[in-house]
Every structure is written in structure tokens, then in C-alpha cells.
């Protein structure tokens, strides 16, 4: 009975399906669907009929999906039936559209819960059905992504794809191979419409599908090289999004076969892969990634050997323009590919052609302001560092390629341009001089671009980094002698500045732009210069203090009778010959010194402080102060040549500033004089005085312990009147000063003063020297009163005796004062403004010679300090024409007179003459050459006899000794009276007082 019932139901099912083609409502009846599903379990022989019915249901659903009524009137895209609610006809079609969902649910349950044999059967049926429906109802060619989005919106197609995916998970290895074969066969039959199915289902067997697709493409390519590979490329492109590693593995395997061909198809592997990259940027990117990973130098030789085989393919022979364009489509490894080709360009001409074509097209895209994927690759941090490294390469092709790529990316990312300038400026090009060419080419910018970023921010960036590095004293430890980044930067900037001055950078860098950029960075340069020079100055002062302290301790040890008590049984305060870390300090100081020299060279090359540059007043003052500090730092160089070189650098810097601005001249002169007298006098032979702490009380010593050093002795004159220190013993006997007046350093110092005072436009201008004279009065004289030009009566010197003695002490301690006065004396009438100093010297010498008259038999040594002071003073007066002939020769014969006679001459001849003839600039007139001159040979300027007769009478007593001088001074002078006034033709610029 049950058997008969099944047969009746089968008959009814066949009749209904046969007669229901014109009535979809009848075919999509839920009862009929349930009846068909029952046949699968109860009547396996009806399986083919049932699956045909299921295919019919799927086709009905697809027909409803692609019908015009299912299209959105606004977008034209199909709309899911279940989402429609306004159209009655569409509402009636909804059950038919969703009918296949019942089939999908039942078949999926059968796959998961039924026998394993159902999985391959349902999978094969679903693949065939999807292929037929897709091919039949595809109305236009679409991309794989668009096809997936289009068909997966259809309920039936989505259900079939779900079934296939479920079946694939239950298949065994042989069954998988069979399903893949069916899928590829369907792809061969429907290559234009089945590609999206392969791409969608390829995730189940990614590597197999990818390899099979590639093999199919190679076969088609070998049969017809003009064939289109859109489907194959589309499948690979779609699968790359989730299975890129499998695609790379497939490419790696195929390239291995292509570079070592064993089969006829292997020869076409490389041309096929390169052709495939034209269809998809994703495939191109994956292939390039694989090539970069497996590339070796040996592979290059293989490529050259196999190239004739590949060129036999007509399409590959003419695809170089396509390859050039391919580089611009890379999101990654594009720069690596170009640099690799650049490294090979020296050996292979085709690499040069590839580079030229690629870079020209790349730059053309930039000029046209077109965006391309390679820009993203160039902007990556890793790529940026790789390009910076290539800029330092000795391979010129690699270097210039890296520079051009950096210029390309800099047009869109200015920060990379600034960072690149900063990095290249910090590098040393001593071993690779051609490396500076990359920096020069980079500063030239991208030709043809109007709004290309300037390089001034790049200079400021590197100077900011150097400022931090200099301030923290080299954050990273470096081996001794290694050039620092600061040294390299200023060395490179000097090279650029010198090229700018010699007009050798014209093809690349606009000279005015370079000079303007460096002058804009002047505040940063001065900040670095300030930090560097100040550290050197501190080191100089510290060394001087330690040297003085060592000398004092050594003498103290010799003079003390109780050395052990003084030092508390220890070598207190003594330094070892080489303290730990002293070598490191010396290396750091040497590095700073070299850096200071480079900075000054740069300032001279860019003509910092000249009239053509506009500087704010604080910068002018800072530059002037640092220039003077650098001069004194340069005097500490170890050799004469280095000192001279440093001094000449400072002369150029000082002279340019002082000629341009009066405020700079004032500051420079004040700093030069003040530092020579109070801060760095030890460099110029100044007497070094140790600041002695006589009590030497320890900082944490209690008062009760301090009192133990003292005791109450007998109240006698021998215990009360003593020359020692209570509790410390006798004062040490200091040795006589052993001053070494370095003539070389004094000459350099005088040249520095002369550089500040000299006016190139007005050579005879003495304004600067007059300013030095006034500064000496301000800094040496301790009293603001009685600093005028006139000489008072000799009795008045008792009022200013203390000040005069202090001024005399200043000349004793600082011998350079004599040299400075000698320089001033040669530029008349500047010495007149130092009248108070001359008055103090004359007064003290007069009183001292008068005091020596107490013991008239005491001989005067030739090098006695008083005699030397007197001779120098008289020589200054003669050079400056403040005293007339024959008194101008007095310094030559003064040593032949006794103390009383010298005192007489100083009072009657010198002091009285200067008292009656005030040393004023009004005494001098300007001759035709612009020189200030005092004519003393005319009748009106004849010296009255009261100033000359004392000298005449004293010389007459000693004619045996002073006869030649007497003849020259008096007899010859009287014979020459009435002659024309002398015509001075030269002037002493630097005069050293003997």
C-alpha cells in the first residue's frame, strides 16, 4: 500500500512539474517542494528528476531577481524581493522568489547529517547549476567584485554558493581534486561568467586554485600571445585580498621553474607573469614582493642568460614601456626595485634605459600633479631611510636615483625634504667626495615646479638638532677623533658657501637663495657658536686657575718648614700628571675647537654682519661678543700656524662687522680691551696672581676645632708683631714674577685691535683708535675725577698719588698695555685721549727717581723696571708727537743719567712742557694726505729754551759719552731750522715698545 502511494505521488509530481512551466506559483508550492525532498530519502532513483526540479526552482528565483520589476528605478540595481512592500505584483512574487531557501536548508542538513556520499554529489550539481545560471542571465561584463556583489544579492545564487561551501568542508582529498577539476572545466566552458565563482570559492583551496589558474593562463598565452587574460587576472586579483601568501608562494614556485626551465611551458613563465601584471596592480605588487625577496646577484646573471628565450615571444619583446609604467603602480617595494636597477646600471645598459624611462615618466606625473601609488611607498619611513643610505653610495646611478626619488616625494611631503637635507648635512663626505653632489642636487629642487618647498627649514632643522647635541655634550658616545654631526654639518655648509662664492653651484642652486637661507639661520648658528665658545672659554679659565694654584702650592711647599702639617699628612691639592678622564676632556676640547673654526669660516663665507644683511641689534651685539671670545680662544692653539690661522679668521670677521656698524665696533673694542685686562690677560703675559685663602678653614669644621689652632702667648712685641697667619704659620714667600711676554700673541692681539679700528673706506680715520684710547682710560683709571687732558702743577700729583700708583701697577701687571698705547701712538692724535695714563706714568716715575736720590751711589740696572717704564713712556710721547725735538730722542740717552738728573729732566723738560702745552688733538692739523701731523720745525713752533736747556746742560757735562747724540739733537737741529716741513709718507700700524 505504501509503495503504491509513493508511485502515485511520484506520478503527481512528474505531471505537476511537466505542466507547471507556465505557472511558477504551482512549481514553488511548499507541498510540492516537501514532496520532492521526501523522494530523495525514500526513492533514490528519482534523484536526477528531483535535482532537475530544484534547478528549475533556482532558475525561477534568478529570473525574478533579474526581471525589470526587481530593479531599483533610481540606481538600476536589483533589489531583494523580501525588502519590497509597496508593489502588489512584487508582493505576490515573493513566495516564488524565496522558494529555493527551503531546498537550500534541506540539502544543507543532508550534507551535514546525511551520508558522506551526498557532499560530492550536491557540490558537483551546485557548481554546474551556478555556472549555467550565471552564464545564462549575465547581461553585461562586470568585474569579479561587482559580479560577486550582484549575484550574492540573489537568494538562489547565495544559497547555491552556501551549499558548495558546506560540501567542500566535508570532502576528502580525492573528492577535492575532482571538485577542483569540475570547477576549472566549468571555467574553461564559461570563462567570462564563471570567474567570480572560482574567485569566491577559491578560498577553500587557495593554493590549488591559484596554481591551476596560472597554469591555465600559461597554456592560453602560449597558444595565442594576443589572448586576453582578464578572467585569470580577475580571479587572482580577487583572491589576493585574503590569500596573498598563497599567491606569493605560487609566484615563487613558478619563477623557480621559469629561471630554470625544464618544460616547454617554463620558457613562457616570465613573459606570462609580466603580461598578467598589466591587468591588476595587486598582482603586480605581489610579484614584485616575491622578486625582491628572492633576488640575488647570481639571479641577475640568470636573467641575462635567459633573456633571449623570453625575447622570442613577440609580446615580451615590446613591453618595456609597460614595465616603466608598472613601477608607478607599486604601493610597496617600488623604490627598492628602482634602486636595485640603479645598482646594476653600471654593468647593464638596459637598466639605464629602464631607469631613465621610469624616472622621466615619474617626474612627468609629478609635474602634471597626478597621484600614483608609488608616492605612498616613497613616503614610508623604511623607504625614506633606504633612500638616505643610497644618497651616500659611491655608485652614482644609485645616488642620483635616490635623490630624484626624494625630490619626487618631497613635492607632496615637504617634511621629508627638510628631513633629508638635515640627514645629508650631518654626514661626512671625506671618504666619498662625490656624496656632496647628492646634497647639492637635492638643494636644487625639482626642476619645473613653481611651489617646490625651500631648503631654509631644512637648515633650521639640522641646526636645531646640533644645538641640542652641543648643549648636552654629545649625547651618544663616539670614538676619539670621530667627526661629530656638528662638525660634518658645518663642514658641508662651508663647502656649499664656498661654492656659492666661486659661482660653481649655479646650475643647481640659486646663489641668492643659499646666502639668504644661511643668513636666516644666523640666530641658530650663533646659538651653537655661543655654546661652543663658552665651553672653551670656561676650559681656558679653569686651566689658568689650576696652573696658578699649582705654582703657588709648589712654592708654598718649598718655603714651608712644616710641609706635613700644612698638607695634613696628605698630598692635599696636588694633581697627578694625568688624571682619569683628562684625555677625554682634551679630545672634547679639540673637537669644540675644530667646530669653532668651522663656524667662523662659515660666518666669513656668508659675510655675516656685513652692510648688505639686515640684523637685529641683539644679534649684532651677540656676534661681536662671540667674535672677540673666539679670538682669545684661538690664542690657545698649540702651534704658531694654528694660532695665526685662527687669528686671521677673527680679523676678517671683526673687520667686516666694525666697518658696517659703529655699535659693533664699540662692542668689539670694549670686549678686546676688557678681556685682555681682566679675563684672558694670562695669554698676553699678564702677571698671574693667585687668590689665596690664607685661613684655609674647612667648610664643615666646628668653631671649637678652629680655636685649637690658636693659643695666647706672651704679650711681647715678638709674639704680637708677626708676619704670619694665626694658627697657620708664616706666609709663603712667593718667587719674583716670571712673566713671559709672548711677542707673537701680543702682535696678534694688536692686529685684532687694528682690524676693528681700520676703516677701509677712510684709511686715515682715527675714530676707532680714539675709542680704544678712551676705553683704556675708563678701564685702567680708577677715578672719574681729574681724567682730563691737561697736566696740572707738579705739586698736584700728591692729590692723585694713589690713583697714579694703581695705574702704574696696571702697566706692571699687564705689559700688553704698553703695546696698545704704542698702537695708539702711531695713529695721531688718538693718544691725547689717554693723557691721564701718561700723566700717571710720568708722575710715578718722577717720584720714584726722586726717591732714588736718597742713595745716589746705588747703581741702576739697565733692565730695571723703573728705567724701562721711563724709557717706554718717553718713547710713547715721542711717537705721538706730544713732545717736540730734541726731547723726542730723550728715551735713547736717559739711561746715561743719574737718578737726580732723570728726576730733573722729567720735571723741567717733560712735565712742564706738557703742562704748558696741553696734549690736545687741536695741536695737530691734517695734511694733504689726510694724516694728522704736528709741525715742530717752524719758527712759531720752536721749543722755548726753558724746556730744552736743562737737557742741553746735562749733556754738555757728558759729551764724552753723549757727544754723537748731542750733535744730532742740538747742532743738526739748529742747522735744519728754516727747512720745509717734513712730508710723512707712512704710518706705523703696529708698534711694539721695547
Curated annotation (Swiss-Prot):
One of its GO terms (biological process) is RNA polymerase II transcription initiation surveillance. The chain crosses the membrane at residues 769-786, 810-826. GO terms for molecular function: DNA binding. One of its GO terms (cellular component) is nucleus. Signal peptide: none annotated. It is found in: Nucleus membrane; Nucleus; Cytoplasm. Keywords: Cytoplasm, Membrane, Nucleus, Transmembrane, Transmembrane helix. Residues 571-583 have a biased composition (Basic and acidic residues). The keyword Coiled coil does not apply. InterPro entries: INTS5 (IPR040316), INTS5_C (IPR029444), INTS5_N (IPR029445). It is a multi-pass membrane protein. Residues 559-586 are annotated as: Disordered. Pfam families: INTS5_C, INTS5_N. Belongs to the multiprotein complex Integrator, at least composed of IntS1, IntS2, IntS3, IntS4, omd/IntS5, IntS6, defl/IntS7, IntS8, IntS9, IntS10, IntS11, IntS12, asun/IntS13, IntS14 and IntS15. The core complex associates with protein phosphatase 2A subunits mts/PP2A and Pp2A-29B, to form the Integrator-PP2A (INTAC) complex. Component of the integrator complex, a multiprotein complex that terminates RNA polymerase II (Pol II) transcription in the promoter-proximal region of genes. The integrator complex provides a quality checkpoint during transcription elongation by driving premature transcription termination of transcripts that are unfavorably configured for transcriptional elongation: the complex terminates transcription by (1) catalyzing dephosphorylation of the C-terminal domain (CTD) of Pol II subunit Polr2A/Rbp1 and Spt5, and (2) degrading the exiting nascent RNA transcript via endonuclease activity. Belongs to the Integrator subunit 5 family. This is Integrator complex subunit 5.
Amino acid at each position: 500500500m505504501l509503495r503504491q502511494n509513493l508511485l502515485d505521488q511520484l506520478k503527481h509530481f512528474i505531471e505537476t512539474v511537466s505542466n507547471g512551466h507556465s505557472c511558477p506559483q504551482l512549481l514553488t508550492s511548499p507541498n510540492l517542494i516537501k514532496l520532492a525532498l521526501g523522494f530523495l530519502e525514500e526513492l533514490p532513483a528519482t534523484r536526477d528528476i528531483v535535482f532537475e526540479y530544484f534547478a528549475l526552482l533556482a532558475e525561477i528565483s534568478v529570473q525574478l531577481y533579474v526581471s525589470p520589476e526587481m530593479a531599483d528605478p533610481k540606481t538600476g540595481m536589483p533589489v531583494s524581493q523580501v525588502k519590497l512592500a509597496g508593489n502588489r505584483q512584487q508582493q505576490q512574487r515573493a513566495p516564488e522568489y524565496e522558494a529555493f531557501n527551503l531546498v537550500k536548508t534541506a540539502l544543507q542538513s543532508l550534507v551535514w547529517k546525511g551520508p558522506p556520499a551526498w557532499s560530492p554529489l550536491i557540490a558537483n550539481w551546485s557548481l554546474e547549476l551556478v555556472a549555467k545560471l550565471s552564464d545564462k542571465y549575465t547581461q553585461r561584463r562586470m568585474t569579479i567584485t561587482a559580479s560577486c556583489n550582484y549575484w550574492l544579492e540573489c537568494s538562489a545564487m547565495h544559497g547555491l554558493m552556501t551549499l558548495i561551501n558546506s560540501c567542500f568542508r566535508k570532502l576528502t582529498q580525492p573528492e577535492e581534486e575532482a571538485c577542483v577539476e569540475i570547477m576549472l572545466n566549468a571555467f574553461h566552458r564559461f570563462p567570462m561568467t564563471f570567474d567570480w565563482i572560482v574567485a569566491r570559492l577559491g578560498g577553500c583551496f587557495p593554493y590549488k586554485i591559484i596554481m591551476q589558474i596560472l597554469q591555465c593562463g600559461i597554456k592560453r598565452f602560449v597558444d595565442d600571445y594576443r589572448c586576453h587574460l582578464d578572467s585569470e587576472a580577475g580571479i587572482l586579483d580577487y583572491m589576493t585580498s585574503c590569500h596573498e601568501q598563497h599567491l606569493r608562494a605560487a609566484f615563487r614556485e613558478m619563477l623557480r621553474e621559469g629561471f630554470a626551465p625544464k618544460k616547454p611551458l617554463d620558457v613562457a613563465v616570465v613573459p606570462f607573469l609580466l603580461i598578467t601584471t598589466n591587468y591588476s596592480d595587486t598582482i603586480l605588487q605581489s610579484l614584485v614582493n616575491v622578486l625582491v625577496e628572492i633576488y640575488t646577484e647570481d639571479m641577475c646573471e640568470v636573467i641575462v642568460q635567459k633573456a633571449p628565450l623570453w625575447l622570442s615571444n613577440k609580446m615580451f619583446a615590446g613591453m618595456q614601456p609597460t614595465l616603466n609604467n608598472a613601477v608607478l603602480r607599486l604601493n610597496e617595494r617600488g623604490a627598492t626595485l628602482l634602486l636595485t636597477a640603479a645598482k646594476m646600471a653600471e654593468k647593464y645598459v638596459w637598466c639605464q634605459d629602464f631607469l631613465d624611462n621610469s624616472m622621466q615618466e615619474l617626474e612627468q606625473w609629478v609635474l602634471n600633479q597626478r597621484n600614483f601609488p608609488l608616492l605612498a611607498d616613497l613616503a614610508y619611513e623604511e623607504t625614506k631611510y633606504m633612500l638616505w643610505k643610497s644618497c651616500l653610495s659611491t655608485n652614482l646611478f644609485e645616488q642620483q636615483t635616490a635623490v630624484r626619488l626624494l625630490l619626487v616625494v618631497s613635492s607632496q611631503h615637504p617634511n621629508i625634504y627638510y628631513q633629508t637635507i638635515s640627514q645629508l648635512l650631518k654626514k661626512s663626505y671625506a671618504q666619498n667626495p662625490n656624496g656632496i653632489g647628492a646634497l647639492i642636487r637635492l638643494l636644487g629642487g625639482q626642476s619645473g615646479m613653481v611651489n617646490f618647498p625651500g631648503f631654509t627649514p631644512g637648515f633650521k632643522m639640522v641646526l636645531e638638532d646640533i644645538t641640542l647635541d652641543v648643549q648636552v655634550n654629545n649625547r651618544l658616545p663616539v670614538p676619539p677623533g670621530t667627526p661629530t654631526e656638528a662638525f660634518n654639518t658645518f663642514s658641508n655648509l662651508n663647502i656649499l658657501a664656498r661654492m656659492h662664492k666661486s659661482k660653481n653651484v649655479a646650475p643647481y642652486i640659486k646663489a641668492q637663495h643659499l646666502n639668504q637661507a644661511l643668513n636666516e639661520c644666523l640666530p641658530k648658528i650663533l646659538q651653537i657658536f655661543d655654546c661652543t665658545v663658552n665651553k672653551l672659554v670656561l676650559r681656558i679659565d679653569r686651566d689658568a686657575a689650576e696652573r696658578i694654584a699649582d705654582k703657588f702650592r709648589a712654592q708654598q711647599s718649598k718655603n714651608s718648614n712644616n710641609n706635613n702639617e700644612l698638607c695634613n699628612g696628605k698630598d692635599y691639592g696636588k694633581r697627578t700628571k694625568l688624571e682619569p678622564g683628562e684625555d677625554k676632556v682634551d679630545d672634547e676640547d679639540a673637537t669644540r675647537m675644530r667646530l669653532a673654526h668651522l663656524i667662523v669660516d662659515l660666518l666669513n663665507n656668508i659675510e655675516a654682519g656685513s652692510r648688505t644683511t639686515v640684523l637685529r641689534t641683539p644679534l649684532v651685539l651677540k656676534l661681536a661678543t662671540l667674535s672677540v671670545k673666539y679670538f682669545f680662544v684661538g690664542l690657545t692653539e698649540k702651534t704658531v700656524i694654528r694660532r695665526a690661522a685662527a687669528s686671521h679668521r677673527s680679523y676678517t670677521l671683526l673687520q667686516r662687522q666694525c666697518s658696517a656698524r659703529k655699535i659693533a665696533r664699540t662692542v668689539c673694542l670694549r670686549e678686546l680691551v676688557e678681556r685682555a685686562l681682566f679675563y684672558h690677560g694670562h695669554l698676553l703675559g699678564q702677571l698671574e696672581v693667585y687668590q689665596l685663602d690664607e685661613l684655609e678653614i674647612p667648610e664643615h669644621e666646628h668653631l671649637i676645632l678652629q680655636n685649637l689652632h690658636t693659643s695666647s702667648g706672651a704679650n711681647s712685641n715678638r709674639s704680637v708683631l708677626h708676619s704670619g697667619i694665626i694658627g697657620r704659620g708664616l706666609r709663603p714667600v712667593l718667587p719674583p714674577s716670571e712673566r713671559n711676554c709672548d711677542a707673537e700673541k701680543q702682535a696678534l692681539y694688536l692686529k685684532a685691535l687694528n682690524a676693528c679700528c681700520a676703516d677701509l673706506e677712510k684709511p686715515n680715520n682715527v675714530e676707532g683708535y680714539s675709542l680704544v684710547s678712551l676705553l683704556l682710560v675708563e678701564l685702567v683709571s680708577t677715578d672719574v675725577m681729574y681724567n682730563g687732558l691737561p697736566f696740572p702743577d707738579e705739586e698736584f700729583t700728591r692729590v692723585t698719588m694713589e690713583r697714579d700708583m694703581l695705574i702704574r701697577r696696571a702697566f706692571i701687571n699687564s705689559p700688553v698695555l704698553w703695546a696698545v698705547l704704542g698702537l695708539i701712538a702711531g695713529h695721531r692724535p688718538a693718544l691725547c685721549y689717554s693723557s691721564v695714563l701718561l700723566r700717571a706714568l710720568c708722575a710715578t716715575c718722577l717720584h720714584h727717581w726722586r726717591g732714588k736720590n736718597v742713595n745716589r751711589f746705588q747703581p741702576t740696572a739697565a733692565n730695571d723696571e723703573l728705567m724701562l717704564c721711563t724709557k717706554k713712556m718717553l718713547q710713547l710721547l715721542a711717537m705721538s708727537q706730544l713732545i717736540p725735538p730734541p726731547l723726542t730722542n730723550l728715551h735713547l740717552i736717559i739711561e746715561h743719567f743719574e737718578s737726580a738728573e732723570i728726576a730733573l729732566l722729567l720735571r723741567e723738560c717733560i712735565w712742564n712742557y706738557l703742562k704748558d702745552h696741553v696734549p690736545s688733538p687741536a695741536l695737530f692739523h691734517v695734511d694733504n694726505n689726510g694724516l694728522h701731523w704736528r709741525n715742530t720745525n717752524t719758527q712759531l713752533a720752536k721749543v722755548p729754551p726753558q724746556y730744552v736747556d736743562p737737557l742741553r746742560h746735562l749733556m754738555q757735562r757728558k759729551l764724552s759719552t753723549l757727544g754723537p747724540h748731542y750733535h744730532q739733537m742740538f747742532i743738526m737741529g739748529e742747522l735744519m731750522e728754516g727747512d720745509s716741513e717734513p712730508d710723512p709718507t707712512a704710518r706705523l700700524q703696529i708698534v711694539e715698545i721695547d
